[in-house]
């Protein structure tokens, strides 16, 4: 097959989140596959023949057998810490269980958090070009893709996932690098804090598989309080949560105390800005003429914005920091868990996308410099 024909193939879009990886083909409306971005290794000795085969589990199989496995996330706060495991997960994306395709036959759009170390991007390019032999690669910023998904060209995206929270102002399709704000406080920190709070309430979760149970409790039971001081004073109604072993757990004030961390990182001694400050500071770092428009076009993206009460709380906090007469409008698209991937799918389907990517030939000639030249 001629290299041009291969480049004309449908691109593969991989939204490489710290917590969940979403993958599929450009042009599709939603990602074909979504699974936790972790690998599991058996932590006990195999004593029976015909027992679960394999030394490494990824995707649905790792979820299904997680009680037997030591779970490890190769990404922490948007940066890959273990490249071997990350490579295995990407290999699995192409396997017969997932996309069922050969990596060398499709260009790739890969997403990345803004203000990531450039070494992270260089290594990702090296893996895709040298290990997976992809014909072309484009590494795109997550928040900009979320805006593509809504069909807008102007707005400020507040994207909070599992590893990173960032705010990126975009005006008429131009992202403003100097205005980007990022903090490494996100969903996984909320899960860790919830585990600590549940321990104080009498429930102990200590293994890596039990941490996944805590994550599920967070997703199903936690909410953001509009007035945490008031809720602290009231006797919070406890919610019963059924654990995988059938026993029940009563979750009390931890339900709103844990996600409060997103707005008050100092609860765990972190000196980062709260999520509302990240958003407002990003707008204030933009040109004065653009601020009013940006305040009226705030868009939420990522799994950590799905907490019940998140939008109302964010609006009340932003109002305190914004100029008095400014109109504030926050949009929370229903598909915001996937909006980065959907934006990637739209971008990779456009004809102009072919001008944006780095081909294997360019990479062989210029190395990692080619990647930086074509990504912002």
UniProtKB/Swiss-Prot annotation:
Organism domain of life: Eukaryota
Modified residues (N-acetylmethionine): 1
Subcellular location field: Cytoplasm, Cytoskeleton; Cytoplasm, Cytoskeleton, Microtubule organizing center, Centrosome
Main location: cytoplasm
Pfam families named among the record's database cross-references: Actin (PF00022)
Gene3D superfamilies reported for this sequence: 3.30.420.40, Actin, Chain A, domain 4 (3.90.640.10)
Record's GO cellular component terms: centrosome; cytoplasm; dynactin complex
SUPFAM superfamilies named among the record's database cross-references: Actin-like ATPase domain
Residues recorded with modification 3'-nitrotyrosine: 4
InterPro entries given in the database record: Actin, Actin/actin-like_CS, Actin_CS, ATPase_NBD
Keywords tagged on the record: Acetylation, ATP-binding, Cytoplasm, Cytoskeleton, Nitration, Nucleotide-binding
Keyword field contains Secreted: no
Molecular functions (GO terms): ATP binding
SMART domains named among the record's database cross-references: ACTIN
Family from the record: Belongs to the actin family. ARP1 subfamily.
Role according to the record: Component of a multi-subunit complex involved in microtubule based vesicle motility. It is associated with the centrosome.
Protein name: Beta-centractin
Species of provenance: Bos taurus
Record lineage: Eukaryota, Metazoa, Chordata, Craniata, Vertebrata
């Amino acid at each position: 097959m001629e290299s041009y024909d291969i480049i004309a193939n449908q691109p593969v879009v991989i939204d490489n989140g710290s917590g969940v990886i979403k993958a599929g083909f450009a042009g599709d409306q939603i990602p074909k596959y979504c699974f936790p971005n972790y690998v599991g290794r058996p932590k006990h000795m195999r004593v029976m023949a015909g027992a679960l085969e394999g030394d490494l589990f990824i995707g649905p199989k790792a979820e299904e057998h997680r009680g037997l496995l030591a779970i490890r996330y190769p990404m922490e706060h948007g940066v890959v810490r273990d490249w071997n495991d990350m490579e295995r997960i990407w290999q699995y994306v192409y396997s017969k269980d997932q996309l069922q395709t050969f990596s060398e036959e499709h260009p790739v759009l890969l997403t990345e958090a803004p203000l990531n170390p450039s070494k992270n991007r260089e290594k990702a390019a090296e893996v895709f070009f040298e290990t997976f032999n992809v014909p072309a690669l484009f590494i795109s910023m997550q928040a900009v893709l979320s805006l593509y998904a809504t069909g807008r060209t102007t707005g400020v995206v507040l994207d909070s996932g599992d590893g990173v929270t960032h705010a990126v102002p975009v005006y008429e399709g131009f992202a403003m690098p100097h205005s980007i704000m990022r903090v490494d406080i996100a969903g996984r920190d909320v899960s860790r804090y919830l585990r600590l709070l549940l321990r104080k309430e009498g429930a102990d979760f200590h293994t890596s598989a039990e941490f996944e149970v805590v994550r599920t409790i967070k997703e199903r039971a936690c909410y953001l309080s509009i007035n945490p001081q008031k809720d602290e004073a009231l006797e919070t109604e406890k919610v019963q949560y059924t654990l995988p072993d059938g026993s029940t757990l009563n979750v009390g004030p931890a339900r709103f105390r844990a996600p409060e961390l997103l707005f008050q990182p100092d609860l765990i001694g972190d000196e980062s800005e709260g999520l509302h400050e990240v958003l407002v500071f990003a707008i204030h770092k933009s040109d004065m003429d653009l601020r009013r428009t940006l305040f009226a076009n705030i868009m939420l993206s990522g799994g950590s914005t799905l907490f019940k009460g998140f939008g109302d709380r964010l609006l009340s906090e932003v109002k305190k920091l914004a100029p008095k007469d400014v109109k504030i409008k926050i949009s929370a698209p229903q598909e915001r868990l996937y909006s980065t991937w959907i934006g990637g799918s739209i971008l990779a389907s456009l004809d102009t996308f072919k001008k944006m990517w780095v081909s294997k030939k360019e990479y062989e000639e210029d190395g990692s410099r080619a990647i930086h030249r074509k990504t912002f």
